[in-house]
């Protein structure tokens, strides 16, 4: 087995294991009572923000490699998840959680279409690009489910924030 295969398998395993609790929290929103779901929705958003902070740190650590040409690009790319988590938390605290989740959803979905990110992702193999696409889709689905919980017209959990 080549070193590349082992590296990809370990990165893929880490990615799926780290997204697993978010999937569990998101799906449990719809199977619990309203008071518990309210807490789980906040926990899911906090966990997603923690994932973004870890992503920021992981990308930031790539700056120390020898290639100085990509150092500024990697710095800019590493600040995007940090900005998404901080502004999402700001909107959730000062407006309501639906706006924070919506902002993080737009960041997560829109990130893939930025030119600076596409130019960096094209440097990797197709297997990494496919993994990035799959994890992005999973995260977007989780965020859509959390957003759907917050704007549910039957239980209307946002009435606390009015």
Locate predicted features:
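The first (N-terminal) embedded transmembrane alpha-helix
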Residues: 9-30, 137-143, 147
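Cytoplasmic-side transmembrane-helix entry/capping segments in multi-pass membrane proteins
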Residues: 12-15, 69-79, 102-103, 127-135
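Helix-adjacent hinge/juxtasegments
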Residues: 61-91
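Transmembrane helix-loop-helix
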Residues: 91-110
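Juxtamembrane boundary at the C-terminal end of a transmembrane helix
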Residues: 145-162
